[in-house]
């Protein structure tokens, strides 16, 4: 009933080399010699005979019990098919979700206070021309620079803030004129 296993040579892997090195201990032989010696020892070693007490209770199993166990394992090996995922159901399956109405923002921000924005654009164009003469010179008024005013004034809706942008851009133009 018990079949003897024939051992193959140990493949040279990191784990096996570590085992060989550990087996060597403090001996002065090379790894190759230790590998050959270990291979020889493993070749001489045979598989131990099967234990008569193979059950967990410590009692040996009869041949009938072994056959029953093997039949049960074969039956358990067949797995049931996987359960399909459930689809998410809506509360009212007959009704489709209503489309949202687009929001009406009124007049776009770039259309508000157009005359004031044109004045700011004229001043910013003069600043751009002045900045080309001396590109390293970048003055600021109240932490506002030419690029920051350029980015923000088009989208501003408040006329007071736009008036402040116009005043700041005029002051910046004066600083650019002085610096040149």
Curated annotation (Swiss-Prot):
<feature type="region of interest" description="Disordered">
    <location>
        <begin position="31"/>
        <end position="108"/>
    </location>
</feature>
<feature type="compositionally biased region" description="Acidic residues">
    <location>
        <begin position="60"/>
        <end position="78"/>
    </location>
</feature>
<dbReference type="Pfam" id="PF11081">
    <property type="entry name" value="Adeno_L433K_22K"/>
</dbReference>
<protein>
    <recommendedName>
        <fullName>Putative protein 33K</fullName>
    </recommendedName>
</protein>
<dbReference type="GO" id="GO:0019073">
    <property type="term" value="P:viral DNA genome packaging"/>
</dbReference>
<feature type="compositionally biased region" description="Basic and acidic residues">
    <location>
        <begin position="33"/>
        <end position="43"/>
    </location>
</feature>
<dbReference type="InterPro" id="IPR021304">
    <property type="entry name" value="Adeno_L4-33K/L4-22K"/>
</dbReference>
